[in-house]
């Protein structure tokens, strides 16, 4: 993988210095970072409004399978989005080779894809 598409479907980053430093290191290794703006998005305790985070998830169906999708952090909040996720479209993208990874709160999304 030479490109990582970041998503932030759960909690906001408490300290953006660490993820920004990680992104700089990845760039220095030749990895292209997409959607880096999600790192600094904040709405209350979440990484954006429910609408922003849901749109970001549903756009995964359009991401090239040549890219790795990585959730920035877990925390709390993805459960609010689960009923409105376009599961069929995202599952089709995964069948086409899209890889998605995350941890913690993001596990609820991963379980929904089973």
PLM features: residue spans?
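Active-site histidine-anchored catalytic micro-motif
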Residues: 46-59, 63-114
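ATP/NTP phosphate-donor binding region
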Residues: 1-65
